[in-house]
Amino acid sequence: MATGGGPPDEALSDQDLPNWSHESLDDRLNNMHWNGQKKGNRSAEKNKKKFVECDLRLTNDISPESSPGVGRRRARTPHTFPHTRYVSQMSVPEQAELEKLKQKINFSDLDQRSIGSDSQGRATAANNKRQLADNRKPFNFLPSQLNTNKEKSKSPPKREASTRSLTKDFLASALNKDFLSNSQAFLEEESKREPAIDSSQVVSRLVQIRDYITKASSLRDDLVQKKDLSVNVERLSNLIEHLKFQEKSYLKFLQKMLASENEEEDVRTVDSAVGSGSVVESTLLTFDVPSEASDTTGVDPRQEAKEELKNMKKQHALLTRMLQQQEQLRTLKGRQAALLALQHKAEQAIAKMDESVVTETTGSVSGLSLTSELNEELNDLIQRFHNQLHDSEDPPAPDNRRQAESLSLAREVYRSRNSSTSDTPLEDKSPLFNNVGVLLEKKQKMDTLLGELHTLQDQQLNNTAFVASSVSPRRSTEQRTLGSAVSSALTSDNRAARSPVTIGAYQTASVNESEDEENQNPAEKLKKLKEVRKRLNELRELVHYYEQTSDMMTDAMNENTKDEDETEDSEYDSEQEDAEPTTNIRNPQYRSSWAQMNINSNNQSGTNNRDERQLNTECEINNRSAVNLRSFNMPSALDCLYNIEHSDKEEDGNRELDDEDAEDQGSRASLSSQNSVADDVQSVDFEQKFNRLVAAKQKLKQLQDLVAMYGDDSESEPVAPERSFSGDQFPPEATTLKQQPNNTRPNVSKAQKDIALKEQAREKFYESKLQQQQRELSQLQEERKKLIEIQEKIQTLRKACPDLQLSTSSAGTNPANRQNRQMTTTTSTPDVNTNGNIVVPAMPDPEDSSSVDNEVWSEIRKHQILREDLRQRRKQLETLMAEHQRRQGNTETTSAASIRSDDSDTQGLQQQTRTEKTMATWGGSTQCALEEEEEEEEVDDEECLSDVHQIDIEEDEQDNTSCENNSYPQNSIRKTSFNGRSSKDGWKNQCPLSVEGNHRPSPKTRQQQNVSMRRQENYRWMSELSHVEEKEHWQEQIDQIKKQLDYSTSICQTLMRDQQALSYLLQSMITTPYSVMPSNVGASQVQLIMHQLNQCYTQLNWQQSNVLRLKQMLNDLLVQQPQHLQGESHQREDRGSSAPPLTSPNIFPNFSFLPPTMNLLNMPAFGSIPNVVPGMNFNPVFPHGFENFTQNVASHTDTPLQPHDQNTSGKTEYMAFPKPFESHRSNSTEKERNPPKKPDESEQGRRVWVENHQKSDQEKKPACFGAGLSAGGASAKLAEESRKVKQFDEVSVESLSSMPDPVDPTTVTKMFKSRKASAQASLASKDKTPKAKNKKRKVFHQKSKGIKSCGFQAASASSASEPNQTTCKHAQTEEVVVGNVIKTSSAQRVEKESKATEMSSEAGSDVSMFETLRDTIYSEVATLISQNESRPHFLIELFHELQLLNTDYLRQKALFALQDIVTRHVSEGNAKKHETCTKALESTGWMASTSELTPSESLVTTDDEMYAKNSDGPVCQEGEQNDGDNISSLSTSSNFEPFATDDLGNTVIHFDQALARMREYERMKSETENGLVADCCNNLNAAASSLEGTNDEARGRAQHSVDDASGIPCPYIDSKQLDRQIKAIMKEVIPFLKEHMEEVCSPNLLTSIRRLVLTLTQQNDESKEFVKFFHKQLGSILQDSLAKFSSKKLKDCGEDLLVEISEVLFNELAFFRLMQDLDNNSTAVQGTVSRKPEAVVVLESFTKEADKEEKTCPEENFSATRETDDEDKDKDETETAEENRNFDAEVLSGKSDISEEDDLDESLPVSISFTKAETQALTNYGSGEDENEDEENYEFEARPVDVQTSLETSSEIADETEKEEMEVRPEANIENEKALSLAVNVMGELSIHEDQAKSDCDVLAHPSLLLSNEKATDFSGTALVNNVKSPVDSPGTSGAGSSDTESPVLVNDFETGSGNLSQKSDEDDFVKVEDLPLKLSLPQEQIMKDIEEEENKNNLCDEILNINDEENGADQLAGDPLALKEPDSPAIHPA
């Protein structure tokens, strides 16, 4: 600062400086990131990594990490301090924008105390790392120091060293070089610029600039504070940097001006200032003022400028003098200023440290005189060192480099950058070499003082405990840094001359240690610290000097520095000590005997930093604590540990070498440091410890190998090696990760501990850990034995089920397990370790992790890559396994897998919960967590071994690292958890059959889940977390319940033994034709057996009452879990629980009857047992829908009514669950209604089964997996099937679809088989989670699939769980909509809840039911909320509605209402399904299932298709479902989860009323128009069923096959039509938006947009009230949705706005259309409108489903494409946001409609991107089909009429083609289209398909189109006409034109005779025959004939299901695409 340029820079930076000084060092470091300084290297890298971690911390560790320094930091940087450090010249708009961003981003201060001051600073710094470089360099000296203190408070260990180094480097380097060079450069530059400019102008400019900087800084700080590390922050940082540069330039210029004026004066002033420190003061005036200002919330920039002017005058003098002075003086004075700053900081820090280690800001500078003296002495020393450097050999220089490096690699870099500069000053300072001797003496004294200070600080820190430790590590680091700096100089001296300084260093080091040991009193330490304060300041100055010296030396050594690590290590090692050259690069630090502690720590840090930051951090941390304590030995030990770790990774020999080296080095260091004894002792200890570690690691490896050998047998063996490798390789890293946190903590704890105590404790810990590890190893060995036994059992199971086991276990599980294990080892270890890190030391760990050396990171990266590879392979394996399982006993495999999954999930997930959570933070960690769970569960023992191995290593290392206590406890915890898992696994192993059988499949299942979960890894993540947490909460309960169940099982077994005969009878009967039991087994026998079983149950009932209560809780939990795939996992776990009972499957099979009751509760738990027991299966039927069982028993075996009795007895308690199963009961009730047809019922059961099955398929797959492994023999297989059925039923109980099977075991068996593929697929989605990758995913996936309904169901179910109340409303609506779906899952849950509530009331567990459900409800609600974040109004309304369900009575009433709806719908729907669809199983499967799952219909359809696909390629299924999940999650996650529509939420508000109204209207219209009064909308339930499964539509189908076919699709809502309609609307909206693109979204504009949209979506339906209701709802939703865009520039939010509008429109129109669709004859359209929320929910599900199905069906071949579409649409959503700007014609062109085709043929204007529309309501513009943008515009203009209605959308492809044609020849097209539409409408069948295929219209819009058409047909031919494409439809009509949407466009289906034509008679709306494409030359009669033929030939279900077969993707485009004239807009496919 005395240097000419320095003051201006400082003055410039001073504003920043205060802030920086207050900000974390990282901020300054990062921001300043002294460009030329070496600090950058290590400290910069550290800072970078820290910053990375800061980011992590900001995200993860902000509070904790920053918490240590919160108070401190807060004290330093008053939160009140304006963050306007960096005021930048931001334009007002930019500032406003930043403000907006800040406000927007500033969700919370992120604990601004910590973040604002530190994290924010760090984040800002990170953003500004290089930006402030020169600007803040001077300032950073003080800020660095101050911040160093802060940093001490923060992450003292890590930042400490970097801070010290940075500070020193900054001070030395920055002052020397930046100030000198930069200042001069600037000054000269300025002088060159405008020396004549008035200083006042410059001052005003400076003031302005500083004001800008302040503003920009504040903005950036705010942004950073808000974690907004966005481009804005970077821009701000750049701006600030630029401004500061200008400021600097102006200051320099001003100073130069002033200097020119006051040059002489100032020279003298400078001289005096130098002596008196006024220079620093003058330079610091600005600093201090700003710092004070920052402390006092900022000084007016102008005041600052004025003060700066004053300062600048002074500084001008300084500058003048600087100009006069040589760079030597400038460097010296810069150093002086830096030293003064450092001293000031150090004094403050010391004072605060003394006062309160936390408070580190006070303290008087040792004195300017000292500084000046030090400057002189430093100059002398520098010269001497410089001379010595020249005189000395290179090795000393490398040593210095290394030590300097230890000081700071960054510094070296800086030095290398500024080497010439510092050399020059050094040369200038050559006269000072004379003073080197004196300075060396002083330095020795300083070193001694440093030693004392270190001792005091260390001791003080130790005494001060954590606070002190946090500070002292820093200080120690500082001192070590100082020492290392001194040592660096000394080392160079040592090598060069072995100068006394070196001796001083040694003495200092020894003194430090001795003092560390001696001065352990905090008081003494404080005193000495105070005394040492000056000394420390002096030492700091010396450090700076040394840094400078090292800089000079480094400059001299820079060439060498680059080769320093190895070369210097070798040189240094060889020179210093024996040549342990490169091997112990880490250890050279130790080799740096002179500064063993410091250098070890520093070099360790430095070298390790180069190599591995984390390790450096460890080392630093350890060195900070340990080095402070035993920095010498600790670093050695740490290095040894570290080296051993890595050496272990590399070679034990290397470890030993490293240990020896470390020991030798430690000894050498000790000898060098004269503390050889302690070091030797420690080194010996460490050596022993290391040997122990090595031995332990070897043992662990051996154990791992053994475990690997035994774990998977042949398969595990390769895995074990992998794991060993991964474990050995990565775990050390992981260990390092753990260690680091451990080190971090131990630093604290050990900081508290004395060195000796630490060593002793360390030894104790090592011993204890070794003992524990030995115990754990013995445990692991025992577990390994168990695993071996399990393996044997598994082998037995494999023999029993060779295909299953081999394929599942071997092919899938084992490879997966290998991968999983390896992943587990890798993932688990890293993740687990990470968990340990994150969870336990999470805050420091991220830093450590982030700080971990590049090596660690590279290895971690490698492991992650390997993990990804493993995941990919696992996915492949899962795919193969899924197919294999499908081919093989899907049920068996699935059952076993499910069981296994349950076990593994239960056990694994419980503990994995954290792991998963933690892992979630790691890329694939979540999956890894799951995999780990699997692995850990299966491989827990092995994993534990590996983990223990790692842990042992970690523990040893950590112990060595002095992280023993914390490390080991964590490790112990991990081990405990692992052992717990192992124990659980052991327990599972105790139940090897189901457990193992499940064991292996489970990994598969879980792998499959993981497959899809990987895709939706993040998605699953949420619900899983909640579920995992829930699991954690109730896992114990589950375990207890399982124990009780086991106990009950044992009792039941005893009872069953008493009834062996019955068991045998049951088994024999069941073993005989499985269906015989329920259907044919002598009723008397069955009754007798059931009666006896009931007696047994009665005996057990008291137990079961308890067990049932527990099980009810379990089931509730499980119900929740099914909702979350984890629920299924939990069920799997429960199955696992039941799996333990499975250990006595035969007994339980006998006892299975009890299990039914228990199985209802136990189904998950005893699910295996039920599976085991065919007879049990008989009961599983009951358990599955135990209600159903009772009913079904009544149906199947009236005697089983005793099961009824069971139900009665168990049912009272049990009823709660049967009630949840009452959906099943509904099914079973239907089946019971059907019972007369028990065979039929079997069939119906099949159908229901199919429906359920398809639902269940998802569930059944898990069931299949679970069951698959359950049994070993035929009976076992049967039992498995029973088990499967049961598990399936369990799962299916989830889906309620198993019931039919349980009801009719035959059905179950048959359906079970038929389900295998689909069930597996479904299970994959549900159980496996791949389908429903998350339980959320499950919901989503279901959602996405039409699982939308299911998902919706799940959502409803979730809601049903908590929002049971809302679900009652929603579920009523939804169940009306989703009906069966919700009924199935939601109703199941709800029924479970309601019945459980009932039964709970009956069982006295009413509260417990809801309490049990509460977690699920919370998780569901959390999921719901998270998924509906985009529609807060929905959530608000939903919760408002839920709040209304404030009593159990209301809840039960709602649940019962749902049950009634579901039951009625199921009974009616199933009857009609069976009646209506002969394609029954599949058609009915998905149609009936659709009835249940109206959205799920698509799900089912999608499932069937997907199942077929999945059978063909589970990947597609997963992908599709993933796409569906993603899409539905994306589009419907907000839409669907929230019950698929925001509207639903709004609707829900008055949904009952509106729904009642809508239903009434629907009823009226359906009566009047459809004549389907009784069938369609006669009942709300009819409407509900129409909504649900379109059962009414199914009824309609019964009346109208077209209506039937279309009926299903109707609720299925053609997303294409919707997409088209929305596009049409958006075509109008987008131009409007474009017109106002530059405007701000004012309320008026938004209102105009809303009105425009509403106008475009005007429904001309007769049912004005529904239309009004719809529009009112839509308007309110639009208003709500658009409100968030208020005050934003349209161009900024236009995409989002369009997306929002399109999403809302899609939801609303889909709902509206769904409501219409509910009116199978578009009569109900009005009702639909009123019911739209419901309809939208289902509709969206359908629409998405439909899109998915359309994609699925038409695109079966395009499945991938569809997936791609979905993905693309997902992308498109994002892209659409971008492309939304392009959204004009493209999207509107209906391209979204042909999204599939777009994927196929981007040129195709039509794309079924409505998935985007689904995903992005705004598919219209945002469908990502922007390429059609022009076309869309053209279409808008060319055929504004051609607003595609949803009907039109269904024919969207055709329409697109037609559009192309129509645009080419719109009228003819319209006519043809209209004719076709009419024909299609009349036919309403796939014939349209053909006709349209014939006709240019790609009516081939396929089933989806047909669906749409059928919908339209149901609603009106208009829909088909629209589908065909009513180009006439105006954009508005597209919104309102489609009959589905009641858009005027709807040309009523003449067949339906709905008034839609008249209603929609708007000419624009009418698709006129003349408007139809000319290509549609077929007369209407011909078309109708074709349609009829097509319809006769093709069932819509068949068509949809078979679209792949019937139509290729190319064929899907009906008509001759080549015949289509390319529309003007190129977007339309030129074909």
Swiss-Prot record:
Single Gene Ontology MF annotation: identical protein binding
Q: Where in the cell is it found?
A: Cytoplasm, Cytoskeleton; Cytoplasm, Cytoskeleton, Microtubule organizing center, Centrosome; Cytoplasmic granule; Cytoplasm, Cytoskeleton, Microtubule organizing center, Centrosome, Centriolar satellite
Gene Ontology biological process: cilium assembly; intraciliary transport involved in cilium assembly; microtubule anchoring at centrosome; non-motile cilium assembly; positive regulation of intracellular protein transport; protein localization to centrosome
Kindly list any coiled-coil regions of this protein.
302-394, 523-549, 684-711, 757-805, 858-892, 1025-1049, 1550-1599
Q: Where is the composition biased (Acidic residues)?
A: 562-580, 930-945, 1824-1835
- Region annotation (Self-association) ranges: 1-484
Q: Spell out the Polar residues composition-biased ranges.
A: 114-130, 469-494, 581-590, 667-677, 736-750, 806-823, 888-898, 960-981, 1004-1013, 1524-1533, 1843-1852, 1922-1942
* Chain intervals with Basic and acidic residues compositional bias: 42-58, 149-162, 1127-1136, 1221-1247, 1771-1784
Q: Which Pfam families match?
A: PCM1_C (PF15717)
Which family does this protein fall into? Belongs to the PCM1 family.
- Protein's name in the database: Pericentriolar material 1 protein
Q: What is the scientific name of the source organism? A: Xenopus laevis
Taxonomy of origin reads:
Eukaryota, Metazoa, Chordata, Craniata, Vertebrata
Q: Gene behind this chain?
A: pcm1
